[in-house]
Amino acid sequence: MNMSKKKIFISFDYEGLAGVTSWNDVEKKSSDFKRYEMLRQLKAFLKGLEGCEVTLVDSHAAGDNIPWEITEEFPYVTLVSGGIRQYYMMYGIDESFDFAVFFGYHAGIGTIHANMDHTYSSSSIHNIWINGVEMNEALINAAFAGLFNVPLACLIGDDKVITQTSKILPKVLSVETKKSIGRHSAIMKPMATLLNELEECAKELSTKSREDFEIFRFSSPIEIVVELSDTLRADLVSSMPLVERVDGRKVRIKHDDYKVIFEALLAMTYICAAARILV
């Protein structure tokens, strides 16, 4: 590990940011799209990472939310943009990274009073369990980073995702962007306060070493149970290899390799997304 220049992987999402409470706020085609609020928060964090090597992976919706021009202001940032790609939210992670950062993450589906709660697909997935533990996107993706011995070191999101994730990964640095009080409501702190917290957290992260954090992994054999939003979607994904139908809406996969589990989950979301067009 290069102690003088940390290499940081940032997986970017939108729903966990301050200033947004509804789907229109995070939909690029919407007149209510909150790009200004997003960029203020993201730039504050990137400012604190000066001197690091940063890969920023735009992982919300079609992956086209962050303008390429951000790399002019922050020349130490490489931006990954665009839709369907391998490992989607985690594209490009490998053993060379010191830390993973999850920016703008949100609580898992079904979390009480959580702003825009969902897990991978708000329209198709009702719940996900891995080895009996209810999942959110932060935990699912942290385990994928663990395949490459990269720890989740920093989590930026609402209070609910931080509470969920810190129960399992208590050493993770975090910045609470907002207090969620309902599916489409949240309490926002003053912007100046949050921007300062984001920059200071990034500066603190740049002083840390990989050993300060935990590598998250699931013990084998790994079992994922996905509850789909309806029986049609369960019908569709049941055609996938390794998938076992549990009941009307639930399917299950067991495997020793978490990469297989992770890619199967992505395949389910893609199949269900395509089905919205066909049926």
Predicted regions and their residues:
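N-terminal glycine-rich anion-binding loops that anchor highly charged ligand groups
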Residues: 9-22, 34, 49-52
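Short amphipathic alpha-helices and their capping/turn segments at secondary-structure boundaries
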Residues: 1-8, 85-100
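Short catalytic helix/loop segments, enriched in acidic residues and glycine
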Residues: 24-47
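Short beta-strand segments
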Residues: 11-12, 57-58, 100-104, 155-156, ...
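Glycine-rich nucleotide/cofactor/substrate-binding loop typically near the N-terminus or early
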Residues: 42-95
